């Protein structure tokens, strides 16, 4: 039983102890809140300490961030107006003020946040990687030189090998070109021989056609026709050089030798297009060129047969006449019209030469085509076939062979009329006259070419103008777009600036909030913090150039500090100094000098106290000495400020006096007593001059009258009489002219006193009165 009782007693004791432990244990929610509160307070204190450290070290942005975070933490926990937030807001505003000074100051650190030391360290590492010439020995230098020379020698050897490889390749190319040239010469020679054979077989056909054309009308004609061909390599020098002979050159040569009755024909065709295009013939006689192209069968105006001339292309691109067809011309009375159209000129020129000898032999020099000519004798005309590359030349009485080249103009149509052809003497004459056209074909061609060129130029100019206008429009559009974009950007920037609050404004808000929080507390520490808040608010006002507000804030700070601080405290000296600066900025130099002098007094008191404490102290006086040295360094700066304030006061007084003088002169001009005396003196000086020159005035008037009345002779006499009368009146009483008004007054007084004494005095006064009246008028 005893064991059971002891067991139950033990169980009950355990239960009671468990209940007590549960009662003593706090609730889980309240414990978590306490832990969080402790964490926030400790974190805020850490941030405040870190911010003060950054502020002392000069890292202003880091200090601002630390104080901002601390203020936000405390504000979330206690509320923005809680007493616990006052210190965080104060230091946050102070750091913002320093940041604003750094941004606005000219001597601010522009490289803030840039890791200059790290960059320098990187540079040193890079430089260490590069070898320095000073550290290299002579042996190393020699090795480097040998390596450089070896490398350069290898480069030169490679260059020479490249050149040696290039030379044989060039030689091979030249040899292949020479072989190709020889083959081309051989190829060119073969068609030339064939041309000779074919052209030599042509005289029989030529004679037959000429005989049929002549009939009985031409007793004498061409007996023989010798056609000789030259090789293409014996071409005219101008054709070999690729030069083209213009129509003006042909006309000049024809005009020089027109008296000999030579007709020159020159044709230029593409060798490859000879079979496709019809032959083109240019006839010239006595300086009149004619271009003929047999595009279609020629309508001769009668019932004569119509025949076509066809050209074929040789194996080497050379056209040779296969069919020679004669055409009969109508009688001399009829004038058929031949429509000629020039074919397109190509790069290959073929100058043809045909000469008629006096003996009646025709010598034809073919090059690339067939000649189709025209010759007449007697009353009828006979046709002679020619190759495309030749022209027929009709001569008189054994004229010499002439060589002329002409370049055909593409797409040219001319109408020619063949007039009467007559045969006279032993020779053969061919006369071809142009139709009665207003302008020659060459002129027409030139005019057409000029018109085409002008049209092209105008089109080009119009195109350029349109392009230029389009470009200008595009540029204007771009400029407008850029302006609109810039305007939008400026607006957005202005809006952002308006939205963003400056550091000074934010500092003012934080310090004002801290001042309110500290002022409602009665403790000395809180009041001193409030005084410091007033001081920093004054500095913000100075930065924003609101000097009156700054003076008010500094004065409030001074009042609070004087209540709770000793007379030798350095905070008082600082407040006096800041107040003196504010007065100086506000042009209140007397008050500025007074505040600066009070600051010096406080510093001197502090130095005296430190000296006493240093004497009393038994230990090392190093701390006191350091503070004394700091205070001594501050004194010269404050004294310099005093001198500046006094000097500016003097200059300001002088400027004020000058300004007042100018204002007084401008406001009282003409109304001051000096102005009145000057006006009186002017009046007095005018009176005697008027009195003295009264006679002169009369003479001037008489002079004017004399000019207007020239025929009157009495006017000068009357003027002289008036002068004689007036002069004794002016000079009689006093003997001299009156110079001033004061003399007139004195004479009047003297004459008034002497009236009763003598008649002479009375007469003098009368004369003086007369003079005064004369001067007054």
From Swiss-Prot:
Residues 464-474 have a biased composition (Acidic residues). Residues 152-496, 667-777 are annotated as: Disordered. InterPro entries: NASP-like, Tetratricopeptide_SHNi-TPR_dom, TPR-like_helical_dom_sf, TPR_rpt. Residues 342-353, 667-681 have a biased composition (Low complexity). The modification Phosphoserine is found at residues 128, 244, 312, 399, 411, 440, 469, 486, 492, 651, 694-695, 715, 734. Residues 117-128, 211-244, 458-501 are annotated as: Histone-binding. GO terms for cellular component: cytoplasm; nucleoplasm; nucleus. It comes from Bos taurus (Bovine). It is found in: Cytoplasm; Nucleus. The modification N6-acetyllysine is found at residues 34, 243, 285. Binds to linker H1 histones. Interacts with histones H2A, H2B, H3 and H4. Interacts with histone H3.3. Interacts with histones H3 and H4; NASP is a histone chaperone that stabilizes and maintains a soluble pool of histone H3-H4 dimers. Interacts with ASF1A and ASF1B; the interaction is probably indirect and mediated by H3-H4. Also binds to HSP90 in the cytoplasm. This interaction stimulates binding of NASP to H1-6/H1T. There is a cross-link at residue 725 (Glycyl lysine isopeptide (Lys-Gly) (interchain with G-Cter in SUMO1)). Residues 484-493 have a biased composition (Polar residues). Residues 152-186, 227-259, 267-276, 303-319, 710-728 have a biased composition (Basic and acidic residues). SUPFAM superfamilies: TPR-like (SSF48452). PANTHER family: NUCLEAR AUTOANTIGENIC SPERM PROTEIN, NUCLEAR AUTOANTIGENIC SPERM PROTEIN NASP -RELATED. GO terms for biological process: blastocyst development; CENP-A containing chromatin assembly; DNA replication; DNA replication-dependent chromatin assembly; protein transport. This is Nuclear autoantigenic sperm protein. It holds the Pfam family SHNi-TPR.
């Amino acid at each position: 039983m005893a064991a059971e009782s002891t067991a139950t007693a033990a169980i009950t004791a355990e239960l009671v102890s468990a209940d007590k432990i549960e009662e003593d244990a706090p609730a889980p929610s309240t414990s978590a809140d306490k832990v969080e509160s402790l964490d926030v307070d400790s974190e805020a204190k850490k941030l405040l300490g870190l911010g003060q450290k950054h502020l002392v070290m000069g890292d202003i942005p880091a200090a601002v961030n630390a104080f901002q975070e601390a203020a936000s933490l405390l504000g979330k926990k206690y509320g923005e107006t809680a007493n616990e937030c006052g210190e965080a807001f104060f230091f946050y505003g102070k750091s913002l003020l320093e940041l604003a000074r750094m941004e606005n100051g000219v001597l601010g650190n522009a490289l803030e946040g840039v890791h200059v030391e790290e960059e320098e360290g990187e540079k040193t590492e890079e430089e260490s990687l590069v070898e320095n010439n000073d550290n290299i020995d002579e042996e190393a230098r020699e090795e480097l030189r040998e390596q450089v020379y070896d490398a350069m020698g290898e480069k030169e050897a490679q260059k020479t090998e490249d050149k040696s490889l290039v030379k044989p390749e060039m030689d091979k190319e030249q040899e292949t070109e020479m072989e190709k040239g020889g083959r081309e010469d051989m190829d060119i020679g073969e068609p030339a021989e064939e041309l000779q054979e074919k052209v030599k077989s042509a005289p029989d056909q030529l004679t037959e056609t000429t005989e049929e054309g002549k009939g009985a009308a031409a007793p004498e004609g061409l007996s023989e026709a010798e056609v000789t061909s030259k090789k293409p390599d014996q071409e005219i020098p101008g054709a070999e050089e690729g030069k083209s002979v213009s129509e003006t050159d042909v006309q000049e040569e024809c005009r020089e030798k027109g008296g000999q009755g030579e007709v020159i024909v020159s044709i230029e065709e593409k060798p490859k297009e000879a079979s496709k295009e019809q032959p083109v013939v240019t006839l010239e006689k006595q300086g009149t060129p004619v271009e003929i192209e047999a595009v279609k069968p020629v309508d001769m105006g009668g019932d004569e047969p119509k025949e076509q001339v066809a050209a074929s292309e040789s194996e080497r691109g050379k056209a040779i006449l296969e069919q020679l067809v004669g055409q009969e011309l109508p009688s001399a009375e009829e004038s058929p019209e031949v429509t000629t159209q020039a074919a397109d000129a190509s790069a290959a020129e073929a100058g043809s030469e045909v000469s008629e000898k006096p003996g009646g032999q025709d010598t034809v020099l073919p090059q690339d085509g067939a000649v189709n000519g025209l010759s007449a004798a007697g009353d009828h005309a006979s046709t002679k076939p020619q190759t495309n590359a030749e022209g027929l030349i009709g001569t008189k009485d054994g004229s010499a062979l002439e060589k002329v080249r002409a370049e055909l103009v593409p797409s040219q149509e001319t109408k020619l009329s063949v007039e009467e052809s007559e045969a006279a003497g032993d020779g053969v004459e061919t006369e071809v006259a142009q139709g009665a056209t207003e302008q020659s074909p060459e002129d027409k061609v030139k005019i057409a070419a000029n018109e085409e060129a002008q049209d092209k130029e105008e089109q080009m100019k119009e195109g350029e103008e349109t392009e230029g206008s389009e470009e200008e429009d595009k540029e204007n559009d771009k400029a407008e777009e850029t302006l609109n974009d810039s305007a939008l950007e400026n607006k957005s920037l202005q809006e952002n600036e308006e939205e963003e609050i400056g550091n000074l404004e934010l500092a003012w808000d934080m310090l004002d909030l801290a001042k309110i929080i500290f002022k409602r507390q009665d403790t000395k520490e809180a009041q001193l913090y409030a005084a410091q808040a007033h001081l920093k608010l004054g500095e913000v006002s100075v930065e924003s150039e609101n000097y009156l507000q700054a003076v008010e804030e500094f004065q409030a700070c001074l009042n609070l500090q004087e209540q709770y601080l000793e007379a030798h405290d350095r905070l008082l000296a600082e407040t006096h100094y800041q107040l003196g600066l504010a007065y100086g900025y506000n042009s209140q130099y007397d008050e500025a000098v007074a505040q600066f002098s009070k600051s010096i007094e406080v510093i001197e008191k502090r130095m005296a106290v430190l000296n006493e404490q240093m004497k009393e102290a038994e230990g090392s006086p190093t701390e006191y000495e350091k503070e004394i040295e700091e205070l001594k360094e501050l004194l010269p700066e404050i004294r310099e400020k005093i001198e500046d304030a006094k000097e500016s006061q003097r200059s300001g007084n002088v400027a004020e006096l000058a300004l007042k003088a100018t204002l007084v002169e401008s406001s009282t001009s003409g109304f001051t007593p000096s102005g009145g005396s000057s006006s009186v003196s002017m009046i007095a000086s005018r009176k005697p001059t008027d009195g003295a020159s009264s006679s002169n005035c009369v003479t001037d008037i008489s002079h004017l009258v004399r000019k207007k009345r020239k025929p009157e002779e009495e006017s000068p006499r009357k003027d002289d009489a008036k002068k004689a009368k007036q002069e004794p009146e002016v000079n009689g009483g006093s003997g001299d002219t009156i110079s001033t008004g004061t003399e007139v007054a004195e004479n009047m007084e003297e004459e008034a006193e002497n009236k009763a004494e003598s008649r002479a005095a009375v007469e003098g006064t009368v004369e003086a009165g007369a003079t005064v009246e004369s001067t007054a008028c």
